[in-house]
Design a protein with these regions (language model features):
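Short acidic low-complexity segments
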Residues: 5-8, 116-127
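Substrate-recognition element of Asp-dependent hydrolases with the DxDx(T/V) motif
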Residues: 17-18, 29, 38-65, 78, ...
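Conserved small/polar residues in nucleotide/adenosyl-binding loops
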Residues: 280-284
Length: 284
């Protein structure tokens, strides 16, 4: 449901769950007004975390890119789908269990951080299998995860984005590779860490709580993104208020005619809306 507020959103909410591409940056370039708006919100006491379906980029690498925009960012503030997926698996299997990992080094490291044993063969009899974005994947690696899943390993994935934009055009994304395993085994993943599932926002709330502090209540969190079918839908599924910005893929026409499950709580042309009184209408 669309809302309006008499206070700036950065004062009305304690925790901002910010998408990255199309909101904070486009590729290597910062989105206009984004960094200054984030700094202002943090100056008012808002905590900011950055959420991304990308499962291959290390948190430290993303943090360094954001520091290049003059943002004060620590790696823990970057919540990738690998971080979320590894935590999901760790809660589902015994400590020290064998987990087949098909993904980039970042995913392998996150699984190992959870006290799980990373394996590369179905012959190791893993109790779980996790698949993430891995453009260098071989046929044999894909076959191995299919064997593991077919043998009963619980199947997790980092995200189900079917496509990924590249300089030369649209390429198959993680979801397309996952479909190959589903088609081979007939088994659907039990969980996906990436948006539009709400797990990423739920884990971000937990990770923002330090030194035994209670997590910020959902009602005090604001999900911010440019994509209705990922960022905003994840907020709606999880019960989070959301802010849609028009600096990425969504245009005013799509916002006006979005079905209910894709409608944001607030709308702004860019992240300056984070520090302004927010209204529900768009000026076209």
């Amino acid at each position: 449901m669309l809302k309006s507020t008499t206070r700036p959103l950065s004062e009305a909410y304690q925790l901002a769950l910010l998408d990255l591409d199309g909101v904070v940056y486009r590729g290597k370039n910062p989105v206009e007004h984004a960094a200054e708006s984030i700094r202002k919100a943090e100056g008012l006491g808002m905590t900011v975390e950055y959420t991304t379906n990308n499962s291959s980029r290390l948190q430290s690498v993303v943090a360094d890119q954001l520091k290049g925009f003059d943002l004060d960012v620590e790696p823990w503030q970057v919540i990738t789908s690998s971080v979320v997926a590894a935590r999901m698996v760790a809660r589902a299997v015994p400590q020290g269990a064998k987990v087949f990992v098909l993904g980039a080094q970042h995913l392998r490291e996150e699984v190992a951080k959870q006290g799980l044993e990373v394996v590369d063969s179905a012959e190791d009899k893993p109790v779980a299998a996790i698949q993430g974005w891995y453009p260098d994947m071989s046929w044999n690696q894909m076959a191995q995860i299919a064997y593991a899943v077919e043998q009963g390993a619980t199947y997790f994935v980092t995200n189900r984005d079917l496509t990924i934009p590249r300089e030369l055009g649209i390429a198959p994304g993680c979801g397309s590779m996952i479909m190959a395993v589903i088609n081979a085994t007939g088994v659907e993943p039990v969980s996906s860490a990436g948006k539009p599932e709400s797990a990423m926002y739920d884990e971000a709330r937990l990770l923002a709580a330090h030194d035994g502090a209670e997590p910020v209540a959902k009602e005090a969190c604001l999900a911010i993104g440019d994509r209705l079918d990922t960022d905003i839908e994840a907020g709606n599924r999880g019960g989070y208020d959301s802010l849609a910005v028009l600096t990425g893929v969504t245009n005013p026409h799509e916002l006006m005619f979005a079905p209910e499950h894709l409608r944001p709580t607030y709308i702004a042309k860019d992240l300056t809306g984070l520090n302004a009184v927010s209204y529900t209408h768009l000026t076209l």
